Amino acid sequence: AFLLAATLTISSHMQEAGAVKFDIKNQCGYTVWAAGLPGGGKRLDQGQTWTVNLAAGTASARFWGRTGCTFDASGKGSCQTGDCGRQLSCTVSGAVPATLAEYTQSDQDY
């Protein structure tokens, strides 16, 4: 089973004018195909980091890990966990099973 907290480190940093940067690092002993909406997707071998820059005004984002993936040179393929429409670069949410992290930015302070 894939556990996001145990395998990927996700850190966020506020940038100029409300833009946000996420650094997603694979701390697993195996390859993970990270996915994000918005953001797409990227293969991460052990120790690799994927930086996702979200534009100012992006209200929300979600990130998850995919395992057991195979993709061809055009980015078409599939994953055993977290598959997102048989694409390397996700444009739809991942299928279960998947553990994800969500980010929402608003002016509400609770």
Curated annotation (Swiss-Prot):
The keyword Signal appears for this protein: yes
Pfam family, one: Thaumatin
Chain ranges passing through the membrane: none
Signal peptide: 1-19
Disulfide linkage: none
The entry's keywords: Allergen, Pathogenesis-related protein, Plant defense, Signal
GO BP field: defense response
Family membership noted in the UniProt record: Belongs to the thaumatin family.
Protein name: Pathogenesis-related protein
